[in-house]
Amino acid sequence: MGSLIIEDLQESFGKEAVKGKEITVHYTGWLEDGTKFDSSLDRRQPLTITLGVGQVIKGWDEGFGGMKEGGKRKLTIPSEMGYGAHGAGGVIPPHATLIFEVELLKVYE
C-alpha cells in the first residue's frame, strides 16, 4: 500500500482547514501518465466540501488537513486512498495513483 505524498507549493497564513470545516477549493487532477481527468479551474467553478466526513476520497480528506487559506499543494494519492480497484466513471482506471494540484480558497467558520 502506498502512502499519501503532500508537497506544499505555496504556503499561506490564512484560516486552517480541519476536520468538520466546510472549505472551498480549486483543483486539477491527473493520472500518473499526465492525462488530465478533471479540473475545477477549467470549469471556472470551485468545489465546496466538508473536510474529513467522507464526502470525497480519503486522499483529499487527509491531504487538505492543516492547509491554510490561500495555500497550494500537490497531492500524490495512492489507489487505496483514491478510487481503488473500481476506478471511477470510465475516466480513472482501477488501481490508479492520482496527482492533484489543489488550492484552498476559503475555510468557513
Curated annotation (Swiss-Prot):
This is FK506-binding protein. Belongs to the FKBP-type PPIase family. Keywords: Isomerase, Rotamase. The lineage of its organism: Bacteria, Pseudomonadati, Pseudomonadota, Betaproteobacteria, Neisseriales. Residues 20-108 form the PPIase FKBP-type domain. It comes from the Bacteria. GO terms for biological process: protein folding. It catalyses: [protein]-peptidylproline (omega=180) = [protein]-peptidylproline (omega=0). PPIases accelerate the folding of proteins. Gene3D superfamilies: 3.10.50.40. Its EC number is 5.2.1.8. GO terms for molecular function: peptidyl-prolyl cis-trans isomerase activity. It is an enzyme of class 5 (isomerase).
